[in-house]
Regions:
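A glycine-centered beta-loop-beta connector
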Residues: 31-34, 39-55, 96, 104-120
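Extended aliphatic helical segments
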Residues: 18, 24, 40-41, 57, ...
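Tandem CBS (Bateman) regulatory domains
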Residues: 1-13, 52-82, 88-97, 117-149
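The conserved cystathionine-beta-synthase
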Residues: 17-35, 42, 82-100, 107, ...
Length: 149
């Protein structure tokens, strides 16, 4: 059984953190420069939420909403369901589907352990015969290269 801990071990350990008071425009630039769709929001070593492209687009659709005047705290998702490091990929998929989210923060007790995306879960489910480490290590997450080992 593939658990959250197993998926996190095989992902890059580098998470992209941002402070809740960071300006939204700067956060957008950071997302773009890193080619990421989310940033983990941390304050004094404590998980606060996730800043996502999806949440940003929803806020920007609000009439009169000005990104230049907003902080990450104004946009971040704080009520996402969470998984434990022992959660199975099936449990995590159920959480994502039932809560309409693409990201799950993962905790080891009360300690933030990382984020698992829908994409991470799909890779783990569709390609269980090869190491996720091989997949994540390939330049663009190349399925064919990872399958060939």
């Amino acid at each position: 059984m593939t658990t959250a801990a197993a998926i996190l071990r095989q992902k890059s350990t580098a998470f992209n953190y941002v402070h809740p008071q960071y300006n939204v425009l700067e956060a957008i630039r950071l997302l773009s420069s890193l080619n990421r769709s989310f940033l983990v929001v941390m304050e004094e070593g404590e998980y606060k939420g996730i800043f996502t492209e999806h949440a940003l687009v929803q806020k920007m659709a609000t009439p009169g909403w000005q990104a230049a005047e907003k902080t990450v705290a104004d946009v971040m998702d704080t009520k996402l369901p969470a998984a434990s490091i022992d959660s199975s990929r099936h449990e995590m998929m159920q959480l994502m589907i039932s809560h309409h989210t693409r990201y799950l923060p993962v905790f080891d007790g009360y300690r933030f352990a990382g984020v698992i995306s829908m994409n991470n879960l799909l890779k783990a489910m569709l390609y269980p015969s090869f190491s996720l480490e091989e997949f994540f290590a390939s330049p663009r997450g190349d399925f064919d290269a990872a399958l060939q080992g």
